[in-house]
Amino acid sequence: MVFTDLIFLFCFLPISVLLTKQIRNIKLQNILLVVFSLLFYAWSNPIYVVLLILSILWNYFTAFELEAQDDKKTKRILLIVSVAVNLFILGFYKYTGFLMDILHIQSNLKIALPVGLSFFTFSELSYIFDVYNGKSKPQKNIILFTLYVSFFGKISMGPIVSYHEMEDQLTNRTLSKAQYASGMVLFSKGLIKKVLLADQLSYVYSILQNNTSTLGVWLLAISYMLQIYFDFSGYSDMAIGLSRFFGFDFKPNFDHPYTATSVQDFWRKWHISLSQWFRDYLYIPLGGNRIDKNTYIRNIFIVWFCTGLWHGANWTFILWGLYYGCLLLLEKFYLREKLEKLPKPISHIYTLLVVLIGWVFFMSPNITTAFSTLGKMIGIGATTFANNQAKFMLKSYFILFVLAILLSTKVYDRIQIFVYNQYKMKAVYTTWTIYIILIIVCIAFIVGGTYHSFLYFAF
């Protein structure tokens, strides 16, 4: 089940919200949310609920053992074992096929990736690390810990919420009209982003995948660049929005990343929860930036190798991660001062270009295809500059491209603020009217079967 399924939109979500609203006791609310979350997770493949529960139990009991240990060496060994078990589960389901390919092992073994495994594993690891470092006490209530890991608002594709950020909200949260209203706005924005922008860009991308002209390849890369933003930020908006229906308040996962003026700035704005996870639980424990230059360089490559590998079992993802590691090192040691002196439009264009190149690695099925695509973008290997298909797609979807580019910036937010300041309540009524119309259009697309699964659903 995903957020754009009709059964979720018209049955699962309304029923869970209405039932939770009727219950005043937060303990009973939590039990109900656990039931709904496990049902949500079981919908696509019930057998993996067993894996989820076993994973929860392992980390639940391990945390008590960690706190009980006074001997630092024993405690550290227990931490290593706990992390190893979590990573083994993740690795078995996500990387076995990749490893077998590397070792040239022939097998018909097909291992399906459990939904949200990468996300809930990182949530559990954050809990173990928080307990180990003394940021949090072990959660004695198994219901609360299960809710933290399995809450259906974030288990599929995040955001990755650290335990210490959600701990108080598990037992101390309120449901208000303001939360419902802001949650509805955010959920609606996410649905519109996904169905009316990401899915339409997905169609453009699918049509252009075999195009061999320079213009066609540029349109291919740009359509993917915009699609993945609206797809994933749309999901994140829906997740954060619906979480507010139940009193949870999660931090934004995106902050207009395509307005960034450096690669470092881009990663402050893109998939923020993942960036913060790697910063808090890998980069800083490795020494952060308070170390010598060679160790710093090593740590950057470790972090970005892991970031790439987390995204998928393919050399293209690893190369994508290392590519960003190299760019961040270049900016830190050579380009930072130069970028700061450049006019913002120039540094913005630089950032968009290097990010676009990164998405070419990310979207390609293999490294050969990635470099072939990059070659065609500068005319190497392209059959022509612009063939008929590329011209037709540009002409037919020009408005979509322009609209998507504008909406990926802060233009809409600024217009909304200006209009509200000028017209107050009239602006609110008009905005809601537009939202309702667009939501009806979204539902029509979904009913017609012209929507696609979320891209990050595969990660």
Residue ranges and their predicted role:
Residues 1-408, 416-458:
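Membrane-embedded transmembrane alpha-helical bundles that form the catalytic cores
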